[in-house]
Amino acid sequence: MPEDVLDTYEREEPDTEPETGLATLRDPSDIGDVGTADRAGLEDGDEIGGTAHTAPGNVARSSAIMAVGTICSRVTGFVRTIVLAAAIGTQLLGDAYQVSGMVPYMVYDLLIGGLLASVFVPFLVKRRKLDADGGDRTEQRLVTLMLLGLFVITLVSVVVAEWFIRIYAGGFSGAQYDVSVILARYLVLQIFFIGASGLASAMLNARHRFGAPMWAPVVNNLVIIGVCLWFLSIAGSGSTPEDMLAHPSQLALLGLGTALGQVVQAAVLVWALASAGFRWRPRLDLRGSGLGEAAGAASWMMLYIVVAQAGALVSTNVATRAGAAAADLGYETGSGIAAYKFASMLFQLPYAIIAVSVITALLPRMSEHVAAGRRDQVRSDFSRGFRLSSVLIVPISVAMLVFAVPFCVMIYAQGSTSAADAEAIGRILMVFVVMLIPFTLFQLQMRVFYALGDTRTPALVSIPAEIAHATTAFALLWWMEPQHVVLWLPVPYGLYYVIGAIIMWGLLHRRLNGLDGHRTALVLVKLHLATVPAALLGWAMIHVFRGLPGDVWPALAAMVAGGAGGAILFVLTARILKVTEVTSFLELLKTRLRRR
């Protein structure tokens, strides 16, 4: 779908004009490193490189399998989030679980995950094409090295789990601290299986077997959903850290059950890899393998990952300290990392569903244009890609702003999460969604640099952006009452992307001889204006249906009426404002529906 829309835009609109005073650059000698198009960022589930390959055989069938798998993964992930909130809530136990659950992924990304995504996967694809044995020896060495490294890292992480909690949650104390340490020891066992899953997925993608990597997370989600429901049926709602210490079997169920989901996911992927013909034969003869040279080329990407992990460390510390302080003051609504994470998961959904698809379609196009010395076409791709993403992300972000609180009450206010807790999540989400456009712009700009073969610039840009994020985040902790800190914590988070996007815009403006800024800004303004009548209708519907009984029916009725009516108003207003991106998208959608 994104490829079709991009092609339609390319046919229907003129090429982007260079900014005033600049000439179009078409230098055949300006060749980038096409291989860097496969270097993925840090977003969850964002495996950009995988879909850039053309699968043999029935491409339509393969694409359909991947699309359905992706949708099922998102849907089951959404359900998992809802069930998890019902099981652990947003109070002290929820904060303990969230911090402990973040530790294995942070450790993995910092020590191995970044290298795997940015270096070893492109290196493996290259060796499979060039080596006489089809890259078999390289794969055997890589698997052996990775599994040994993962085993050692997992073992050490279990031993030092307490230090991870001290680092990431310095504000925890008493039973909350003890529960966090126990959960961390259970959950860091996932590190080995997270790495095995990532490696198996990469090797399957290199073999053009895309189905299993798309479907395996569904199994993980289903296991965790089952574990959370089981935990809720045994422990009941409103469990506290003290309750968990008194019932260690319930704590073991929560921790080991979560880890089991990752184990099952890894097992599915390893089985799929074996079915594809891979047989592991341990090899440690690394001399001459090229792995060291490949890893050495990742220095700038690793710098970016280190800065990103530093940002996660700052946000986690601020949120956990604020949540613990608010609880000490007797504040009953969740004000820590759990509420922040539940809002963040919803915030990233539009980007994960819409913008990631556009990025996947853009990367090979931009890389081809770089290789052909057509930076003017790279500029056109970026402009069209951002405007295409904005056509859906702008109205969705405004809808999320309007319906954030009733929607969060509808999905989260059950089990261990009270209506007041859910309302707090909704208010955090309202602050988050204001940052959705800068977040999307930053991610697209970063992929332009990767298509240009430049990992250095995004890494360097991340440093001042992270300084701004850390400074403002700690300022919130110092100056605000603890129960309000997490509400405004998305502002420092968004500031990182605002500053990063501004800096990268200026740098890309020079690299690409303009960025079609006037047209892009005009489209953004028109799109936001087109959402005003829809937003007013949405707010009106919230007030109209407020009198219905319960928490679910008022929210559901307001969202159905306001969403349907708002969508119609948005399209009509966009037509009046002559937003051609919206009309082109709708025409393409009509054409595809007629074909079916």
Regions found by a protein language model. Give the residues of each.
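Membrane-embedded alpha-helical bundles of multi-pass transporters/translocases
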Residues: 1-596
